[in-house]
């Protein structure tokens, strides 16, 4: 049996040299930072939501509510690990992921290899089962005005026999 999951996450983008920009589990050299209750890693959040969606287990807000002060600035790797544990408990394995980052800045292409390698390590997936792409909104809307960035992620899970 296979299950497909989709995840999406958006965060406000700001210039902030005192907060790191975290994407796909790596710290990126940038004048930009994402605003959020957690470390605001939009890639790991979208992957985590996709896993939960494929398993029909809700979303990360149910497990890690932004109203819980103890979760302030939580490392998104902790969120992902919890979702992977739930996946294993349900006897599923991750087959592949496909992520698209949407926004004008920061440019993702120079970061793609590092992000993909990080995801490979975090997810225990071969590199050829991980796709990280980027696109813009052609300067339209809030993302086009560089007010934020987002990520869409699709995943495939396979039930262990």
Swiss-Prot record:
Transition state stabilizer (site feature) positions: 37, 136
Any one GO molecular function term: 2-C-methyl-D-erythritol 2,4-cyclodiphosphate synthase activity
Catalytic activity: 4-CDP-2-C-methyl-D-erythritol 2-phosphate = 2-C-methyl-D-erythritol 2,4-cyclic diphosphate + CMP
Keyword Metal-binding on entry: yes
Pfam families xrefs: YgbB
Cofactor binding, note field: Binds 1 divalent metal cation per subunit.
Role according to the record: Involved in the biosynthesis of isopentenyl diphosphate (IPP) and dimethylallyl diphosphate (DMAPP), two major building blocks of isoprenoid compounds. Catalyzes the conversion of 4-diphosphocytidyl-2-C-methyl-D-erythritol 2-phosphate (CDP-ME2P) to 2-C-methyl-D-erythritol 2,4-cyclodiphosphate (ME-CPP) with a corresponding release of cytidine 5-monophosphate (CMP).
Family to which the UniProt record says this protein belongs: Belongs to the IspF family.
Subunit and partners: Homotrimer.
Name of the protein in question: 2-C-methyl-D-erythritol 2,4-cyclodiphosphate synthase
Organism: Leptospira interrogans serogroup Icterohaemorrhagiae serovar Lai (strain 56601)
């Amino acid at each position: 049996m296979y299950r497909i999951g989709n995840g999406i996450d958006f965060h406000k983008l700001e210039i902030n040299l005192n907060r790191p920009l975290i994407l796909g589990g790596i710290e990126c050299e940038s004048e930009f930072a994402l605003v959020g209750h957690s470390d605001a890693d939009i890639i790991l959040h979208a992957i985590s939501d996709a896993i939960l969606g494929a398993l029909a287990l809700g979303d990360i807000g149910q497990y890690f509510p932004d109203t819980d002060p103890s979760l302030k600035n939580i490392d998104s790797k902790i969120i992902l690990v919890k979702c992977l544990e739930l996946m294993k408990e349900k006897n599923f394995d991750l087959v592949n992921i496909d992520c698209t980052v949407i926004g004008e800045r920061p440019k993702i292409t120079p970061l793609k290899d590092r992000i993909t390698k990080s995801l490979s390590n975090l997810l225990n997936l071969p590199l050829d089962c991980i796709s990280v792409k980027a696109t813009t909104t052609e300067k339209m809307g809030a993302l086009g005005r560089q007010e934020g960035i987002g990520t869409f992620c699709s995943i495939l899970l396979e039930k262990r026999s």
